[in-house]
Amino acid sequence: MSKNKKLSLSGGDTTEKFIYKPKDLIWAKMKGFTPWPGMIVDPPLDLLSQQRRANTKCVFFFGSRNFAWIEENNIKPFEGPWKEELAKVSKPAAFRHAMTDIEKYIDDPAEVDEQVNKSCGAPNHATEADFDKIRDGLDSEEIVGEEATADGNNGVVAHVVGSPDEGDGLDVEINADSSASPVTSPAVTTKAAGKRTPKAKSVAATSVKSTKGSAKSAQKRRTSAQQSPSGPSNAKRGKRDVSGEALQDADEASSTPTGRRRVETDALLASIAAKRAPNAIALLDRPVVTRPEAQVIDMSSRSNTLADRDIVPSEQTFGFLGLGMMGSTIVKDLIYTGHKVVVWNRTIDKCQPFAEAGAEVKDTPMDVVEAADVIFCCVSDPKGAKDLVFGNCGVLQLKDLNNKAYVEMSTIDPDTSLDIGEGIKQCNGRYLEAQIHGSRQEAAEGMLIILAGGDRSVFEECHSCFKTIAKNTFFLGNIGNACKVNLILQTILGVSLVGLAEALALADRFSISLNDIIDIFDLTSMKSPMLLAKGKEMAKGDFNPQQPLSHMQRDLRLVLNMAENLDQSMPVTSITNEVFKHTKRLGYSEHDSSAVFVRSRF
């Protein structure tokens, strides 16, 4: 560091003002803190984006190893008569650690220098000035030179150190590159001392605000900057204009006729990224929505729970319409326990593994009804369930079901169940609604809950099937009762999931470990296997579908329609339904219902 004229500092003492350079060890005073050991460094890119006062230096603090802008009147050299006094001002552990850290740096600077270099990167003080020119409409062709200069140099990097106050000299270090890399070539140092012009509106300030993208305007700016090196008088851009002066001086000092400068593209992009608003960062950092993994049925796997049950298969033939997530798992267990099964699915390829396992495949639902004694249906929504019964080649195309049983396992509303039951009875059939409550994993382990209503004789005939796929089975009486109970249970599940997702999203904003929250939750009386499982999925970001989010939102919609008919107010369920609808719009329709966490988090 070099000395300059005497100035009066904040303490009233008269001392020599120092012009600091990178790697100068100093004492720095921040508001609210005692003087702290630090080092002058080149500012990192994220610090460049912050507004700062004039006459500030970027300081690296030992101990905490972070960066901040400090005014020059709050900086003193580390070595001096004041060192002993300042070292005794504070004795907390953090201060002692900082003193130890700087002493280690004096002995061996390698570790700290490496950390500072990683944070700050290669010094390029022209980056911000060039960025401003691009922002103000300067043509990119005038920023990035495409041809080499007359003497083979690729550009000039000017490093300005010192105070921009009036009357102070400016030390300009000009690294003239005679090869391809300005970092490795020797530096030629030039001293340029001069007085600043008064802070009045200059020609440069006017030309910077001129027409965007015009080559003529760009030429005016360069000419004006050469005529008036003080640059614009705007206080907020004073610091940036100092870098602009240095670039102009460097161009004049170099032997290149064009003086074109290269802009570090990566540095510019990083500077732009540092200026993004927090909401923009959250939006851009949102995870990419990927398709959930395709669910492949492993026909060779066997559930230990199912193997322990003493199941005697019925001699009747069971038809199954729909081989979706739940349907395929149920059919697999029925085949494994020795039941005779006939299957149909809209996508015929899904039937192939079951055909290889011994099931008979039919072309239409009507063909399945002809070949089976009891027909199960498990599709995704009420409309699909109705289409299979009343549609073309549907169940009722036979006209006479000959006392066959039809079991509706799709999640439907009570009115739809009553309509299907009425149609089956009119065609001389028997009807049972058997709502299944549980996840795909519970279905694979035979741990579902069956809620049945309708014809009691059908319920008895399906005893072996229900024992295969469920741990508990309930007969609830008339048609519609089972649908109501199932939708009520789904309401509890949906509201609980949204509450869990919002709570974990809040913990994530506090930077609290989600796994810690779940571990503590497991010790409370609120715990439940379902919430624990969903919480772990949210913490891991594992949204492979056990119960698709679209199915959960469908159930909530059915609940609200059912409540509307009764004039029953359900405000919390309504909000929960909107949350799931929004999550569907984000692209998580086919993911697990725990993906609602993504919506709460972002």
UniProtKB/Swiss-Prot annotation:
PROSITE patterns, sorted: PWWP
Region of interest (Dehydrogenase domain), ranges: 309-602
Phosphoserine found at: S8, S10, S224, S228, S243
SMART domains: PWWP (SM00293)
Membrane spanning stretches: none
Subunit structure: Binds to mononucleosomes. Interacts with male-specific lethal (MSL) histone acetyltransferase complex at least composed of mof, msl-1, msl-2 and msl-3.
Protein's recorded name: Cytokine-like nuclear factor N-PAC
Originating species: Drosophila melanogaster (Fruit fly)
Gene name of this polypeptide: Ndf
